[in-house]
Amino acid sequence: GGRVLPGSAATADVLPEIADAVGDRVKILVDGGIRSGTDIFRALALGADAVMICRPFLISYYSGGTEGIVTYVEKLRAELTDAMYMCGARCLSDITRGMVREAR
């Protein structure tokens, strides 16, 4: 996990540029750094078609078995739903880049 090269750009920093370059010709799957429902929201807003999550699921499983995974999924769902509600997105396809902005 993590970026391979020190000083490499974070996924979220380059995602909009990649999404603009490929348009609808390629599905964009984002992996790395996705830990919360708000991370999912941000990735979708910046141009991802889907996100992939592994490490948090493994941690959830090792610490709580199947129940740990269920709890983690419920947390992701609640956070994503809250972010969508606060930004006026009724469904995933309503999420747009204009709903997030770069922190300075």
Regions found by a protein language model. Name each.
Residues 1-8, 57-62:
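Glycine-rich, proline-tolerant flexible connector loops at the mouths of alpha/beta enzymes
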Residues 13-31, 35-104:
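Alpha/beta catalytic cores of nucleotide-metabolism and tRNA/nucleoside-modifying enzymes
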